Amino acid sequence: MTTHEPRTVRAPRGPHKTAKGWIQEAAKRMLMNNLDPEVAEHPESLVVYGGRGKAARNWEAFDHIVATLDRLENDETLLVQSGKPVAVLRTHEWAPRVLIANSNLVPHWANWETFDKLDQAGLMMYGQMTAGSWIYIGTQGILQGTYETFAGAAQKHFGGSLKGTITVTAGLGGMGGAQPLAVKLAGGVSITIEIDPTRIRKRLETRYLDEVADNLQDAIARAEGYKAQGVARSIGVQGNAAELVPQLVEMNWTPDLLTDQTSAHDPMWGYIPPVNADEDAGKLRSEHAEEYRQRAYAAMAAHVRAMLELQKRGAVTFDYGNNLRQRAFEAGVEDAFSYPGFVPAFIRDSFCEGRGPFRWVALSGDPQDIYATDKALLELFPEDERLQSWLTYAADQIAFQGLPARICWLGYKERDRAAKLFNDMVKDGRVKAPIVIGRDHLDAGSVASPYRETEAMKDGSDAVSDWPLLNFGVGIASGASWMSFHHGGGVGLGFSQHSGLVIVADGTDEAAKKLSRALTNDPGMGVIRHADAGYDHALDVARERGIDLPSLGIKDHA
């Protein structure tokens, strides 16, 4: 196709490639999989998730990327600048086949206003995290991490289970859509507010949401009934969180657990303010942009004020990394940061172990390949109770979106073992085609985000972004198949920088070497980052597992 028009995209399946190597073929299939209608939020606009997180800058750029990947040699590297292929360079076979940089701006200009001007001029693209790095796998991609968060809340506040509790949250997009099922897995009842009825339907169809209430009062009545019965159940309700959460205050009804995962990171294209019955939010945004922005900020302020009041009344309240607190603070809510972020509250100990999201995709397109890897991992890590529980549940309950895929959380000296296993399975034919291995940018050592992953670091190094740059370099030096460096994922422009790694297990001996190196060093950066910040748990892991940290007097004993 040469007209560069929107069209339905679906990744090729099977053991035969049209590119010159499996890495190039994998990159092409994963780019296309990001835009599969089962996967992407708005594929016709190249938007994958997270407000306007895109896979390619425009359809012309998409076509050029696909064509270039098909002709790319095994010792060449494609450079992609904010979703546009800009060069092919001769490198070497251990170099990444693709290097991606998305949304990066010099710090003084790292804001939405500058980005929007460049975006409108066709010069930039917002890549979110895994949208522009071609490793998004649908809502499952965040599900176990979301479960880890709610399980952490259960452990800290509710005796280890959310049974007999009600969680209220908002947002059923690509990220937030994991919340209802995650709360259910942790044993609880949830009410999730979502303004877009198509997103509600999508979560029902993919079994991430159980049922939809007629209104907020109906949702509360249903939730109270399930809570009394000790039943885990998820309820959706259509509405605007900036209106419904304050209604909870007015109704004098307080949930047990409260958070939010609307797209507050992007005030213009993510968070939708309340509008009058005779108004259209999209039209208001396009015709009266400044009024829309002001309304969005006012709505976020009202939303957070209500959350703060519910916190005072006893709701365990946390921020889910969408920068809602910062937006409310900018709108005049001085105590917006009175409730914590989810990472310091529940996840940091895992990061100290280099433990984070590890995902893989079957390029064959055959679900049986994923089920085979599930079984193999259960045998490889019999002592990991969380992994055993998760993979057993996932194999039975999780609906695939696009190419069959799986995610689990693994740490330092675990991811490399899993990758070796997968490569052996490709080599001996236990799976029908190569396997792509990647992760979210939300990981132990790959991101600087002071209101999310690096919030409240022990040594005050929240905003130091040397670490994701080092992570990016380490992946390149260690044999990754493609690497990405992005700005603004999760919390919006000006508030984060982060790196992504993807590597292909194609069954070859060379792949085995790359997998071992890359998937040891990448999670190792998480241990290193937290050990350097002074976390005792990370220091213990570094000593026990043999990481050479010269400034801390720890040497590799492996």
UniProtKB/Swiss-Prot annotation:
Catalysed reaction, written as an equation: 4-imidazolone-5-propanoate = trans-urocanate + H2O
Enzyme Commission number(s): 4.2.1.49
Group of enzyme by EC: lyase
GO cellular component, one term: cytoplasm
GO biological process: L-histidine catabolic process; L-histidine catabolic process to glutamate and formamide; L-histidine catabolic process to glutamate and formate
Chain segments annotated as transmembrane: none
Keyword terms, alphabetized: Cytoplasm, Histidine metabolism, Lyase, NAD
Active site location: 408
Pathway the protein takes part in: Amino-acid degradation; L-histidine degradation into L-glutamate; N-formimidoyl-L-glutamate from L-histidine: step 2/3
Coiled coil ranges: none
Name of protein: Urocanate hydratase
Species, as recorded: Deinococcus radiodurans (strain ATCC 13939 / DSM 20539 / JCM 16871 / CCUG 27074 / LMG 4051 / NBRC 15346 / NCIMB 9279 / VKM B-1422 / R1)
Gene name linked to the record: hutU
